[in-house]
Amino acid sequence: RHLKFSGLRVERSSFGPGDLSAYWSRYERDDARFIDAAGNERRDVFDLRYAGKRAPFDWDVEAMGQTGHVGAASIGAWAFGALGGYTFASLPGTPRLGLQVDGASGDSHPGNGHVGTFNPLFPNGYYFTLAGYTGYSNLIHVKPSLTFKLAPTLTLMTALGFQWRETAADAVYGQGMAVVPGTAGHGSRWTGMYAQLRADWLVSDNVALALEAVHFNVGDSLRALGARNADYVGMEAKFGW
């Protein structure tokens, strides 16, 4: 299968209180298959991101647009991600109240010769949690969080994540744009929620450990198809040099 990826990226550091970056990329894949289209995929991706910090606030916002075609069908898709926080530096444990909001388009009008499903291309499967239950297509995700610094090198984060489909006309997607069978055009937009508990320990300058637990409660539309609640516990170790 033919696959080609190319692009151009520009960055501007210290743009106000943050860093600004933008890129264009071209994704080419032969014999691509979507629910509503099949053929050679040619997708142009446009991205703009701004991240920074001005105490007590921090933020990281990104917007993406996609055009092109899959076979004879045109592409028009979008996505965004926004993470922000407020740190109470004067309180014990310097708690940080955070909010993450994400969205990725789905195909709201199947059969019209237009593919609206966002393709995350090479996604970070651990973007939401280490459990990696959810893909970044046809998605609305809202996640409030609270983080405490228990020690200079140890932090504890608790969060609740709430998930919907952007449109019920399209499917629920897992990692790698895997379609959950029977979901396209059926059920409600609500797909479920999860609770997350994560501890991060910076052991040394080049060693970091993380322990994470996630409980996912599936929505009724998925439960009707046989899906069940899921629990995940995992540990991650990072070593750098």
Q: For each of these PLM feature ranges, what is it?
A:
Residues 1-111, 149, 169, 182-186, ...:
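Signature for the C-terminal beta-barrel architecture of outer-membrane proteins
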Residues 24, 63-65, 101-103, 158-162, ...:
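Active-site proximal loops enriched in glycine and acidic residues that flank catalytic Cys/His/Asp
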Residues 25-30, 60-66, 120-128, 174-181, ...:
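Flexible, solvent-exposed coil segments and beta strand-coil junctions
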Residues 70, 116, 167, 220-221:
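Conserved catalytic-core motifs characterized by acidic clusters
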Residues 95-96, 101-194:
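C-terminal structural cap/anchor segments
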Residues 152-156, 191-197, 203-211, 231-233:
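A short pocket-lining beta-strand/turn micro-motif at the edge of beta-sheets
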Residues 201, 228-241:
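Outer-membrane beta-barrel "beta-signal"
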Residues 202-228:
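C-terminal beta-signal and adjacent terminal beta-strands/loops
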